[in-house]
Amino acid sequence: DPDFFGILDNISSSLRKVFKTTNKVTFAVSGTGSSGMEMGMNNLVESSDEVLILKNGEFGDRMENLALRLGAKVSTMSVPWGHSFNQDKVIEKIKSMPNLKLICVVQAETSTGVLQEIDSIGRYVKDKDIIFLVDAVTSLSGVNLEVDAWGIDCCFSGTQKCLSVPPG
C-alpha cells in the first residue's frame, strides 16, 4: 500500500530530526525499548567481540547480560546506582582496550533517573574503529541527543517516555 509506505517515510524523516541524524537507516519498530536494545546488540555483537558496558543501573545490567549471552568478551565499568560516569575516566578505559569493538551506555538510566553525559565519549570514539551504542529510551526528546555530532553508531529509544506517543 503506497499510503502506508508514505506514512513510514514520514515517521523516519521525523525521527531523523529528533535523533539529530541524517542517517537514512532511521526507522520505527513496533516494540519496546528492550527490543531496540536486543536488535542493536544482536546485529553488532559477534562471539568473542570485546565489549565495554557502562553500568549504573538496571539497563546497564541488562546490556551486560545480553552481551554475555551473545558470547562477547565483556568488560564493565560500574558506578553506584544513582551516579554518573566521568567521561574522562571512560575514555581512559577505552584507551586501555586496543581490541574494543563496541561500547554501550545508557544516556538516562530509567531505573534511577540519572543523566549520563556522553558527548565526549562519542567524539573520542567517532574516528576510532569502535562502535558506539546508546540507549536513549528515557532521554530522547527530553535532553540533548546528537547522534551524528557525537559519533553514535546505534541508538534506540521508545515512544512511552519523553516522546509521549502511544505505541504502534
Task: Name each model feature, range by range.
Residues 1-29, 34:
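A glycine-/small-polar-enriched, mobile loop at the entrance of the PLP active site in fold-type I
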